[in-house]
Amino acid sequence: LRGVAEKLDYLKDLGVDYLWLTPFFVSPQRDNGYDVADYRNIDPMFGTMEDLDNLIAEGEKRNIGLMFDMVFNHTSTSHEWFRRALAGEKKYQDYYIFKGAPDQPPTNWQSKFGGSAWEYVSSLGKWYLHLFDVTQADLNWKNPEVREELKEVIRFWKAKGVKGFRFDVVNLISKPEIWEDDFEGDGRKFYTDGPYVHEYLKELVRDTGIEDYVTVGEMSSTTLEHCIRYSGAEEKELSMCFNFHHLKVDYKDGNKWEL
């Protein structure tokens, strides 16, 4: 964070007026910080809260706002919420998606990082959903307490002077009402752009008062039509979004791993 602050004059000369900082929160770093263990504290490898306060203040002097990366689809399994869930606290078990019985995973969905999207917890006799790494447990956005916790995170950083928010894979936060196997794919058709995703986004933006902030949504496996809706002014959800359609123009038979 100190290094970024030292470069602010150079960035100002370039015409930069917003800086997007990728996650610097406390994290085991299994996914470059996108496995957040504490949304309100800074990982010592990046600096201190004092360093961040200084960066925000120095940025404001130069009319450079900071945009923080919010990873709200999942947390690290090192997060206090998940650790308390594993300890048997029912409240925190409902913060995540625990399902099924010991004999087999609830669905045949595949993780975007490979393997099953479900991990079994023998002490609970249930499986938890992780669309990404096994250490990134998906949050249960159907639980209003979870949504309120995440709003409080936004309010915390907003009070610090943050001027924008980028939401990681935000179009995956709404999971289906019915959990079923996908015999034609990896399961993404059941959880991408889910049934309540627009409702959740409207609520998050409205209740935290960030309608006029720069808000960016990363869209995983979505359509251009959905992108237009997420960023439409009348929807009051996001300022803009980015997708990955342009990366697929040279895929060979739809496979990104072949040249």
Describe these PLM feature segments.
Residues 19, 165-167:
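Hydrophobic residues within beta-strands of alpha/beta enzymes
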